[in-house]
């Protein structure tokens, strides 16, 4: 069964809304791990709208599971990753005007640049995951740039408005997962997953880890982080 990476970006979103010092993402990560998180994920955006550089530096020293740093494939972010050395990096697309990450990274259209970044990071013993749509061409390109992981973008599945569409999107994810594993990639998934839709994705053969943030932080506002994480672990198990 898939493990759970808890994205704590929106703890920082609340903090940055008032430009204050609380709530503290580092404390949130500790509580998430106490609740059973198998990993902690943060996205250091170029505009620093939520997670800050200092957060990542502190998390590198305090996270006891593993730290997944989401970032754009820019020289600045590569330098930060090489300095901090997270347990692994997930390369994601990024637009300043977006509310959250929209769609997967286009590996096919920028294969030389992505290949260069993957090489730099993995030569420094930092495994790289690529956040992509489950398109056969994107999976093939991910193999070509020698990434260790892909993270399948589950947004269309999560946003499906009827059962027929949802099942079509799930089948698309399943096919992508199977193709990637056969090609030697390890497979994670995330984006838009909730307590109510997570199990079918978690149950896909070979799925390793689900990176989930917004729904857990929303639930945590009502019941606390530890309980919210425990409940997501139960949902992943289909309980």
Swiss-Prot record:
Location relative to the cell: Cytoplasm
Catalytic activity, EC: 2.6.99.2
EC primary class: transferase
Function: Catalyzes the complicated ring closure reaction between the two acyclic compounds 1-deoxy-D-xylulose-5-phosphate (DXP) and 3-amino-2-oxopropyl phosphate (1-amino-acetone-3-phosphate or AAP) to form pyridoxine 5'-phosphate (PNP) and inorganic phosphate.
PANTHER family: PYRIDOXINE 5'-PHOSPHATE SYNTHASE
The protein's assembly and partners: Homooctamer; tetramer of dimers.
Name this polypeptide is given: Pyridoxine 5'-phosphate synthase
Gene name of the encoded protein: pdxJ
């Amino acid at each position: 069964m898939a493990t759970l990476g808890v994205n704590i970006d929106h703890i920082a979103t609340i903090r940055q809304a008032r430009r204050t010092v609380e709530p503290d993402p580092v404390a949130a990560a500790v509580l998430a791990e106490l609740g059973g998180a198998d990993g902690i994920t943060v996205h250091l955006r170029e505009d620093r709208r939520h997670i800050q550089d200092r957060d990542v530096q502190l998390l590198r020293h305090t996270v006891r599971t593993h730290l997944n740093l989401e970032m754009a494939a820019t020289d600045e972010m590569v330098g930060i990753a090489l300095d901090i050395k997270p347990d692994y990096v997930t390369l994601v697309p990024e637009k300043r005007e977006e509310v959250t990450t929209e769609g997967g990274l286009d590996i096919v259209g920028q294969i030389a640049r992505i290949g260069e970044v993957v090489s730099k990071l993995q030569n420094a013993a930092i495994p790289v995951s690529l956040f992509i749509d489950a398109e056969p061409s994107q999976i093939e390109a991910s193999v070509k740039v020698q990434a260790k992981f892909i993270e399948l973008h589950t947004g269309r599945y999560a946003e499906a408005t009827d059962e027929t569409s949802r099942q079509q999107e799930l089948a698309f994810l399943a096919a992508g997962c199977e193709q990637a594993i056969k090609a030697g990639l390890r497979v994670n998934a995330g984006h838009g997953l909730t307590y109510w839709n997570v199990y079918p994705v978690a149950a896909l053969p070979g799925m390793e880890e689900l990176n989930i943030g917004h729904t857990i932080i929303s639930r945590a506002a009502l019941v606390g982080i530890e309980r919210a994480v425990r409940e997501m672990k139960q949902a992943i198990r289909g309980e």
